[in-house]
Amino acid sequence: MTKKIDLAQIRVLLLGIWHFLLHLRQRLVEDQINIRAGHLAYVTLLSLVPMVAVTMSMLSAFPVFKGIRGQIEAFVYENFLPAAGDTVQVYINEFVGNASKGTAVGIAALVVVAIMLISAIDKSLNNIWRTKEKRSVVVAFSMYWMVITLGPVLVGASLVATSYVVSLKLFEGDALSGMMPLFIERLPLLFSVAAFLLLYMVVPNQKVKFWHALLGAVVAALLFELGKKGFAFYVTKFPSYEAIYGALATIPILFVWVYLSWMIVLLGAEITAAMPEYLDYESSSNAGETQPLAE
């Protein structure tokens, strides 16, 4: 009897997952996330240098971050730009150095371009959530400005806090010292989960449940880590792009990786947005009021 009950529960669970995946596939087709990801990748490449310039300027305003700027850069490029991170870092730092020498008008233009990226992300995610009510211009600008100003500070503060925790004598014992390499190794994954969770909860102009956002964030973070390893493996083992593009090989590598990254971000958003729809369908279906979400 127990085995039959267990098998029945497993069957119901698998059937529920299957129906959810069908609904998710239908959503992905309707929202054309491949086209959205391409648009966001294009805007990201245009905004990359301005965004980095504004970020570094914000960090430079706080003396506590000046000594660890190199560590922050190394962490970001190593963990978010696989394989070609060193080359990209050299070029971006050179571009940022040139941009920082500009006039007040030029710096204002950099901020505007950086806001364009955040605005594009905002519109894409709210379209995924089918948000009908738009934010007012004042609220939207305030949110974008908060992301630009507070985002870099929070990232820098988290890295400083992590470095401080790792350096504590509390972790120098034999039992705990073996855990630190594992903790540091998992740090990029934890940062990714936190970043995706914040993105999926704050950006949509409607209430998003924590557990729904956490599910989407965990899936996106895991795919992001797998994507980094897979992309780095391809770039190092099959370097045909270098023979084709030569010195410009970094450009297509960066574009492809940014495109794949946005595909992952949007997929996590679709999962988060699809969860309440599917759960509402399940509750209504049990009451005999609705038809299946997807065939």
Swiss-Prot record:
Keywords from the named record? Cell inner membrane, Cell membrane, Membrane, Transmembrane, Transmembrane helix
Cell inner membrane as a keyword of this entry, yes or no, is yes
Instruction: List locations, semicolon-separated.
Output: Cell inner membrane
Listed InterPro entries: UPF0761_bac, Virul_fac_BrkB
Keyword Plastid among record annotations: no
Q: Which GO terms describe its cellular component?
A: plasma membrane
Broad class of the protein's primary localization? membrane
Superkingdom, natural source: Bacteria
Q: What membrane topology does the annotation report for this chain?
A: Multi-pass membrane protein
Spell out where the chain crosses the membrane.
4-24, 45-65, 102-122, 137-157, 183-203, 213-233, 247-267
Protein family membership: Belongs to the UPF0761 family.
Name of the molecule in the record: UPF0761 membrane protein SO_4401
Species whose genome carries this gene:
Shewanella oneidensis (strain ATCC 700550 / JCM 31522 / CIP 106686 / LMG 19005 / NCIMB 14063 / MR-1)
